[in-house]
């Protein structure tokens, strides 16, 4: 039986053994390096989590600290004794002020060292300590939110160039409104008092409101517009309070113009009546308005414009000089004025050549400025209806017929009034 042969391996040399040892060490080093890198990534992730938690806790701590400070201040205010609320009447000296406290009366009080006396103007609301009556705090003005809504934030964009046929009225209103605001030194040099109020009266649609907006634009004043019907309130005393706060806001934003439209709704003549149907509240509102007109000085740069189409029913106490210093009438435009108004309202329209606006003005005898503007609008609507991009003479004639047709018997009584 033959023996199986076994292949003999060559003997391992020292060099080969060294290489094997180095290879095993390299593999072991790569494993350790990978392990340490993974461990390092894990530690970095933990460090980021801890930093995030630390920042979150610091933010919570800051928020809690601010709440604690706020609560401490609130607690301190609650622990302080209450104060009386008063109104400054007059500054008596360097550290004395005459204050009116309701319902107790008027007192001359000391001023705290922390109060700037230059801020203590008449009608300023202040707080007095209940033990020593020392003035220690200046309070903000209390104004009804409804009154704040009456203030027009944006300066009106109406100008004198947009008003036609009212050259004389523009001249008169410039003298009593614009000139005192821009050049008060002229009145001081002459030694005359500045006018306080102006009444604009005339039929509807003759440009009273438009002229008031133009005055506010050219004088760059705060324009406060209020309708007389807004001052007629349901509860007793509410209308009077709104009138007071209206003038307080006007003083704060001086120079300012208060424009009261439809003044006949609160300024009608008083009659003896015990019916209790709400007329007494309207009369209280008018009396407060008269008081405010008498109370503020003309040098405060507060001007009052009033507009109405029923001057015949206004109370004579409202119309007397010193309250209303000038009355400006706004009649319906004549033929030349109607032509000027038509040119103003049609200058941006795409008109065909040969349109005779003077002929249109002749046909609209007795029309107001609002009706003339309506004619231009209706003429454009007739052109739009026929898919044209220009307005013709026929469009204007049709517009005149349509607008003037509305002037029927229901308006005759008003026209007879203004003849």
UniProtKB/Swiss-Prot annotation:
It holds the Pfam family Prot_ATP_ID_OB_C. Its main location: cytoplasm. There is a cross-link at residue 406 (Glycyl lysine isopeptide (Lys-Gly) (interchain with G-Cter in ubiquitin)). Keywords: ATP-binding, Cytoplasm, Isopeptide bond, Nucleotide-binding, Nucleus, Proteasome, Ubl conjugation. Gene3D superfamilies: 1.10.8.60, Nucleic acid-binding proteins (2.40.50.140), P-loop containing nucleotide triphosphate hydrolases (3.40.50.300). SUPFAM superfamilies: P-loop containing nucleoside triphosphate hydrolases. ATP binds at residues 202-209. The keyword NADP does not apply. Belongs to the AAA ATPase family. PANTHER family: 26S PROTEASOME REGULATORY SUBUNIT. This is 26S proteasome regulatory subunit 8 homolog B. The lineage of its organism: Eukaryota, Viridiplantae, Streptophyta, Embryophyta, Tracheophyta.
């Amino acid at each position: 039986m033959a023996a199986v042969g076994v292949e003999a391996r060559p003997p391992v040399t020292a060099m080969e053994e060294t290489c094997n040892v180095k290879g095993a060490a390299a593999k072991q080093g790569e494993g350790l390096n990978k392990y340490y890198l993974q461990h390092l990534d894990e530690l970095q992730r933990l460090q980021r989590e801890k930093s995030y938690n630390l920042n979150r806790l610091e933010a919570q701590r800051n928020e809690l600290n601010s709440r604690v400070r706020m609560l401490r201040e609130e607690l301190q205010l609650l622990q302080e004794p209450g104060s009386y609320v008063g109104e400054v009447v007059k500054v008596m000296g360097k550290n004395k002020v005459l204050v009116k406290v309701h319902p107790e009366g008027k007192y001359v009080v000391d001023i705290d060292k922390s109060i700037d006396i230059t801020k203590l103007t008449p009608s300023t609301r202040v707080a007095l300590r209940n033990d020593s009556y020392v003035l220690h705090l200046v309070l903000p003005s209390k104004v009804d939110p409804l009154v704040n809504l009456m203030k027009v934030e944006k300066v009106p964009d109406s100008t004198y160039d947009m008003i036609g046929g009212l050259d004389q009225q523009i001249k008169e209103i410039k003298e009593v409104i614009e000139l005192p605001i821009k050049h008060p030194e002229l009145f001081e040099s002459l030694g005359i008092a500045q006018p306080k109020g102006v009444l604009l009266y005339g039929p509807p649609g003759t440009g009273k409101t438009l002229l008031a907006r133009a005055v506010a634009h050219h004088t760059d004043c705060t324009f406060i517009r209020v309708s007389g019907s807004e001052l007629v309130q349901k509860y007793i005393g509410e209308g009077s309070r709104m009138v007071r706060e209206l003038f307080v806001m006007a003083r704060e934003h001086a120079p300012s113009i208060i424009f009261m439209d439809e003044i006949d709704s609160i300024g009608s003549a008083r009659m003896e009546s015990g019916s209790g149907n709400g007329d007494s509240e309207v009369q209280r509102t008018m009396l407060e308005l008269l008081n405010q007109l008498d109370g503020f000085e003309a040098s405060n740069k507060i001007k009052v414009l009033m507009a109405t189409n029923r001057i015949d029913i206004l109370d004579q106490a409202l119309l007397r000089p010193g309250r209303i210093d000038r009355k400006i009438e706004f009649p319906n435009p004549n033929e030349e004025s109607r032509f000027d108004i038509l040119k103003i309202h049609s200058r941006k329209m795409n008109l065909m050549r040969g349109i005779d606006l003077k002929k249109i003005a002749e046909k609209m005898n007795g029309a107001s400025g609002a009706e003339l503007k309506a004619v231009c609008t209706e003429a454009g609507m007739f052109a739009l209806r026929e898919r044209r991009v220009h307005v013709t003479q026929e469009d204007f004639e049709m517009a005149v017929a349509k607008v003037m047709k509305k002037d029927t018997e229901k308006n005759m009584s008003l026209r007879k009034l203004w003849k």
